[in-house]
């Protein structure tokens, strides 16, 4: 039986997802409780840098190859769901913002994978990058939580903002879902940069063992 283009794309995406999951399971990371603060920080910074690079690449691919520069033209109209996140004033605040922003992307990044499979799966590497972003954001969230628990044990988790227009990613209307993807990757690129920058600000205190 010959598969349709949509079915073939779906199977390709599922096989890629399974392959990535097997790869992650086969790699046994060092538990956070066995890392020094500096080692944990280096792990977080490396992960945040990679995540930002991938988010920036996906935005560029979408804008140039799919949306015909509509992402760039409409970027000033984008309001991100994390805009209301509080400004950080202390080292602890920096970590709390990182945790809040990462938390705010957990569900959207899970929803991104099937949306990319449906609408952008034919573009080389987009599916793999969507999976990598989902995994990278989870690792940043886990690591930041663990680091904060060392300096403020028993701290309660703050509320995080929710994206209300995720359903537009699944729209069958091309204009609607392309605009939603543009906004999604614009905001993700912006937030992954914020996380990376905040982690870099923390570096002096980590290196000087102030924690």
Swiss-Prot record:
MF terms in GO: hormone activity; prolactin receptor binding
Q: Which InterPro entries match?
A: 4_helix_cytokine-like_core, Somatotropin/Prolactin
As for subcellular location, the record says: Secreted
- Gene for this chain: Prl3c1
- GO aspect biological process, one term: mammary gland development
Tissues where the protein occurs: Expressed exclusively in decidual tissue.
* Glycosylation sites per record: 77, 173
Q: Print the keywords alphabetically.
A: Disulfide bond, Glycoprotein, Hormone, Secreted, Signal
Q: Which family does it belong to?
A: Belongs to the somatotropin/prolactin family.
Question: What is the designated name of this protein?
Answer: Prolactin-3C1
Read off the lineage from the record.
Eukaryota, Metazoa, Chordata, Craniata, Vertebrata
Q: What is its main location?
A: secreted
Task: Cite the Pfam families for this sequence.
Answer: Hormone_1
Q: Name one GO cellular component term.
A: extracellular space
Among SUPFAM superfamilies, the record links this protein to: 4-helical cytokines
Top-rank taxon, per record = Eukaryota
Disulfides per UniProt = 80-187
Q: Where is the signal peptide?
A: 1-29
């Amino acid at each position: 039986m010959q598969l349709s283009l949509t079915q073939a794309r779906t199977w390709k995406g599922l096989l890629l997802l399974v392959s990535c999951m097997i790869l992650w399971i086969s790699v046994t990371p060092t538990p956070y409780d066995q890392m020094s603060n500096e080692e944990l920080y280096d792990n977080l910074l490396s992960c945040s840098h990679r995540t930002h690079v991938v988010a920036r690449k996906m935005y560029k691919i979408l804008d140039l190859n799919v949306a015909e520069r509509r992402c760039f033209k409409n970027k000033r109209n984008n309001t991100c769901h994390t805009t209301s996140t509080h400004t950080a004033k202390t080292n602890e605040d920096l970590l709390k913002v990182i945790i809040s922003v990462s938390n705010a992307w957990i569900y959207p990044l899970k929803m991104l994978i099937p949306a990319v499979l449906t609408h952008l799966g034919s573009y080389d590497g987009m599916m793999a990058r969507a999976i990598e972003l989902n995994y990278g954001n989870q690792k940043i969230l886990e690591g930041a939580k663990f680091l904060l628990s060392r300096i403020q044990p028993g701290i309660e988790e703050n509320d995080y903002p929710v994206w209300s227009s995720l359903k537009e990613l699944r729209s069958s209307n091309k204009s609607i879902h392309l605009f939603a993807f543009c906004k999604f990757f614009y905001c993700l690129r912006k937030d992954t940069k914020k996380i990376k920058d905040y982690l870099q600000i923390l570096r002096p205190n980590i290196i000087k063992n102030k924690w």
